[in-house]
Amino acid sequence: MLGAYLPILVLVAIAVIFGLCSLVFSSLIGQKKPSVVKLAPYECGCEPVGSARERFSVKFYIIAMLFILFDIEAVFLYPWSVLFKRLGMFGVMEMGVFIVILFVGYIYVWKKGALEWE
Amino acid sequence: METFFFMIVAAVAVLASILVITCKNPINSALSLILTFFCLATLYVTLDAPFMAAIQVLVYAGAIMVLIVFVIMLLNVRTESGRRSSHSVLFGSLIGLFTLFQLFYLFNRSSLTGQKGTIDSALINKVGHTELIGKALYTDFLLPFEVTSILLLVAIIGAVVLTKKKI
Amino acid sequence: MGYEILGLPMAYYIAMVLKVLVVFVFVLLTVAYSTYAERKIIGHMQVRLGPMRTGWHGLLQPIADGVKLFFKEEIIPSKADKFAFLIAPLIALVPAFIGFAVIPFGETIEVGGYKIPLQIAAYYDTASGQVVDLNVGVLYILALASIGVYGIVLAGWSSNSKYSLLGGLRSSAQMISYELAAGLAIISVFMLSESLSLQKIVADQANGAWYAFKQPLAFILFFICSIAEINRTPFDLPEAETELVSGFCTEYSSMKYAMFFMAEYANMVTVCAVTTTLFLGGWHGPGFLPGWFWFVAKVYFLIFTCMWIRATYPRYRYDQLMRLGWKVFLPLTLINIVVTGIIVSL
């Protein structure tokens, strides 16, 4: 167990060190001549209008929520896909029921226009 | 060595979860929560449950937290300013102490430790954790599994109802 | 060889450190030179020369770019959320570079009587005489892919600029949508391999045909979804410069910008390596050359394909992109699973 996971830890450490070094060294080496205009958010060279912290379309939430739900479906499919040859036709049937029920939900989402971007 | 590793990961997990409730900035709280999930996933790996670890990251850190971060961005939650009211501090600590007391009581009574399971590390390493979970889920716990699909269906409909103005 | 630490021989640790370093340097060099190759290949496809000035035919271009970015001024916008702004490139970079840990890139080699599998997160178990790797190798990669989203969403939010916010949101919604489709597309592979361990998936393809032939639909879906997930053309909406300037990294400069750039290319390398392993037989090839050669050749071919696609196709529109992901790919993957299930069990 240890033999397979220890290398991942080492690789994570190397990647983090590499990233931190890039951050630190570039901020040390690079010149710094800050000015009010330079530090303002970019808006095509004009004065920024209003705040960027505004509400955005509800579409993004529905995508995030549907993603969670279908991701959980995928999670249920992983152990099944590994076992399904051993479960035989019975396994296909039970997963068929599962997928069909969720497909009903998918069709509902489609028909209600939650997947439309206009 | 394993205990030592557990100590480090557990300490990080506890620290991160304390940060979740003490950070003034909600995004930093969310980040700490993600770190907590990672520590939990690491603990699952040390407990020979790699599938659980992967799911912990995939579903909790990778899916549910995305939604939470989106919501923080939508609500435009500002950095919390000022002190919390003294009432919430009082009630919060009381509830916390009560829960802690309950936990100690349960552990001392040790009425929770029942029989040991039949699945041990040797079996997991031989058969594979994913396979064992699958076997239990798709034979012994078939009905709960199918009911889950209905739960997910309800959640899908709920998501649409919540976000659509006109249904 | 008698000396052991934590039940593993000394040779294991030496081999591990060597493997980690070799792979890290390989990914880093591939990332650096695929930026060069991309400019060169697309240049020639568009009847231009591409970079020519630095070194012979511009061969030193990536190094010059890297040095230049190191010396650039670091700008942190005054309105930005400092901590999130600084940590976002790190969150994008780290998952991109550690995905390679579970990918087998060659056959087991023997050095001084000790067997070393060419896969970072694996070792040779002398007791059972088998290579032990992660039982959930594929899920590890999917989990890392799901973490990469935060780098982009945080970069977009913390910059406190409208372009960044829109770019970050668009790209995170795109990434999660296609992550879902990619995750569903590869299920039909596990149905054939009966395992999530990449060693076993590669071994199973060596015994039979490549999964690209057994599961052509899954192969195409997975590759397209992966390209969309790593935000490459024709799905590079977050960087749609005609509408969003530079998307989530509008406010980033110097090495922090370079880190997003490296993360993007490292993701491309990882995705190509995963596709090779899952569908193109991994490191297996005609026996006259070593396994790692075939692995690298297949990965580079797929990287070339990514660049070819970039030179060929125009960018998608955002509504078309989301429609494609949710209304075409998602049902197709589910149908593919059901059809595979019925055919195999009949």
From Swiss-Prot, chain A:
Its EC number is 7.1.1.-. It catalyses: a quinone + NADH + 5 H(+)(in) = a quinol + NAD(+) + 4 H(+)(out). GO terms for cellular component: NADH dehydrogenase complex; plasma membrane. It comes from the Bacteria. Pfam families: Oxidored_q4. It is a multi-pass membrane protein. Keywords: Cell inner membrane, Cell membrane, Membrane, NAD, Quinone, Translocase, Transmembrane, Transmembrane helix, Transport, Ubiquinone. GO terms for molecular function: NADH dehydrogenase (ubiquinone) activity; NADH:ubiquinone reductase (non-electrogenic) activity; quinone binding. Its main location: membrane. It is found in: Cell inner membrane. InterPro entries: NAD(P)H_OxRDtase_bac/plastid, NADH_UbQ/plastoQ_OxRdtase_su3, NDAH_ubi_oxred_su3_sf. Gene3D superfamilies: NADH:ubiquinone/plastoquinone oxidoreductase, chain 3. The chain crosses the membrane at residues 5-25, 60-80, 87-107. It is an enzyme of class 7 (translocase). NDH-1 shuttles electrons from NADH, via FMN and iron-sulfur (Fe-S) centers, to quinones in the respiratory chain. The immediate electron acceptor for the enzyme in this species is believed to be ubiquinone. Couples the redox reaction to proton translocation (for every two electrons transferred, four hydrogen ions are translocated across the cytoplasmic membrane), and thus conserves the redox energy in a proton gradient. Belongs to the complex I subunit 3 family. NDH-1 is composed of 14 different subunits. Subunits NuoA, H, J, K, L, M, N constitute the membrane sector of the complex. HAMAP family: NDH1_NuoA. This is NADH-quinone oxidoreductase subunit A 2. It comes from Geobacter metallireducens (strain ATCC 53774 / DSM 7210 / GS-15).
